[in-house]
Amino acid sequence: MALEMRAPLEFWSLMPAMPALMRAPRGDGHPVIVFPGLSASDGSTLPMRGYLQAIGYDVSGWNQGYNFGPRAGILQTAVRQVRDTFDSAGEKVSLIGWSLGGIYARELAKELPDCVRCVITMGTPFSGSHRSTNAWRLYELTSGHDIEKVKDSFDLPKAPPVPTTSVYSRSDGVVAWPASLQNAQSNNPHTENVEVIASHIGLGMNPAVWWVLADRLAQQPSQWKPFSSPSGLPRLLYPDPSRR
């Protein structure tokens, strides 16, 4: 958890990085919904959503207050939000989820593939043991759910049937990074893992992560290609996820 102490530095690094971030691929106006992490609310994703709005997306939060897990009605309300957004916009919705919010984004895309354009998760533990996250006790306390029963209720490791990007950090102080790795699957060749240098708490305020979001959202699903570090940026920002 000591690794999380650097999160304020990630936030303060946004200001000097903004000129470069504003040169990221521009949005086409399609709708984006952002889901916060455990015990967090839309306030935690406000800077990120403001940036995505500024580069050309129609961005909204999940509008359900603090995220205390999939309590009664939570996922049903999220399903309605995705459907209503799709119907009102007349085009598919991109879903972004931070930590636990990424579980929602992935499962919603599995349930509503005709409504979802792409999924991007940040520090989301969907693979392996869910006790690989330091927050599992907090999850059980706040949600009232046994984490293993939740795991058994969903096929979490299975990739959604839409372009899916998992952003993770090997120095994540909350989630063990292997739990955020999407294995190659025959049901969806358009999946990838993108490694960044970030704390878990700082993922949503990290310039390298924001660039990944902009790059992935701008990509047309029919022309999907794996993320490639932009030329001119230090390779250190995006280490090779295949390295040992």
Regions from the PLM with identified roles:
Residues 1-33, 45, 50, 55, ...:
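Flexible, membrane-associating and regulatory peripheral segments of lipid-active enzymes
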Residues 11-17, 84, 88, 141-144, ...:
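A structural signal for alpha-helix termini and helix-coil/disorder junctions
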Residues 13, 74, 205, 209:
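Soluble or luminal CAZymes and related metallo-dependent hydrolases
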Residues 30-43, 47, 51-62, 67-162, ...:
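Serine-dependent carboxylesterase/thioesterase catalytic core
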Residues 110-111, 116-244:
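Helical cap/lid subdomain of alpha/beta-hydrolase-fold lipid enzymes
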